[in-house]
A protein has these predicted regions:
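Class I S-adenosyl-L-methionine-dependent methyltransferase catalytic core
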Residues: 1-253
Length: 253
């Protein structure tokens, strides 16, 4: 296929080199991950090292993995490379097209992959207790807008509305996930008028209220937060520190 030819010409490996599973609760990936079809063009997407670690630790080959905020397709690519069946959902048609293009390569595995438009708050097409692992990266309320006016796009919601709606997401996660299986959610905090708004821990409490138990709280360092230019000026002006970490919550049903 054309994608494989392009990767060969650019000498892009199909799998990461010298990969090792993370063994503690602080993760840092200065290298974004340069294998297969991964890139950082989709704003706010996560490093492929994150879903790879989650998928390899909390699932096995041929398991069903769900990402209901599929975005730029990073989790989808990692599911394919690790031989997991995959369901990718997003409310944004543009995200679905990007994900499909990212999956346009051949590798040694051929898992079942389904990419569909849908709403993470209502996964009616997915049966109860049918998913082995949820691995997803929701928007952080309205920090980054992924569309201008798509109805139901949670990236357009202010924090109060977002937290109400993430409760519906948590309930759907609990419904579709099998008992004793895991749900991984990456979430970050934000600031309003110089004060930290703990979006991540509010989200954690909401998932616990839906029935989940918190197995791990992982601090993920951000490496695109440089104290230069605009950010340095505002840090000094408002006397506040740059938020340079996110939280990866591992929940168990």
């Amino acid at each position: 296929m054309k994608t494989n030819i392009y990767m060969a010409k650019k000498n892009i490996p199909m799998q990461p080199e010298n990969f090792e599973l993370e063994t503690n609760t602080v993760w840092a990936f200065p290298d974004r991950g340069k294998w297969a079809t991964h890139d950082a063009k989709y704003r706010g997407n996560w490093s492929p090292y994150i879903p790879r670690n989650v998928i390899l630790r909390y699932s096995k080959e041929n398991d069903a993995v769900l990402d209901q905020f599929v975005g730029g397709g990073t989790t989808a690519v990692e599911a394919k490379l690790t031989n997991r069946n995959f369901i990718g959902v997003d409310i944004n048609p543009n995200a679905l097209e990007i994900t499909k293009s990212k999956l346009n390569f051949e590798c040694e595995f051929n898992p079942t992959i389904s990419i569909m438009r849908g709403d993470a708050r209502n996964l009616s097409s997915i049966a109860d207790n049918s998913i082995d692992l949820i691995c997803t990266h929701p928007p952080y309320a309205d920090i980054i807008h992924y569309s201008e006016d798509i109805d139901g796009d949670m990236s357009l919601m202010p924090m109060k509305d977002f937290l109400f709606e993430i409760g519906k997401v948590a309930e759907e996660c609990y419904r579709v996930l099998k008992k004793d299986k895991f749900c991984a959610i990456l979430m970050g905090d934000t600031r309003k008028k110089g004060m930290v708004k703990p979006l991540a821990f509010e989200t954690m409490r909401i998932f616990e209220a839906a029935g989940f138990k918190t197995k791990e709280i992982i601090i993920k360092e951000q490496h695109n937060c440089k104290a230069t230019g605009y950010w340095k000026t505002n840090s000094i002006k408002f006397n506040c520190l740059l938020l340079a970490h996110e939280y990866l919550f591992i929940f168990k049903k």
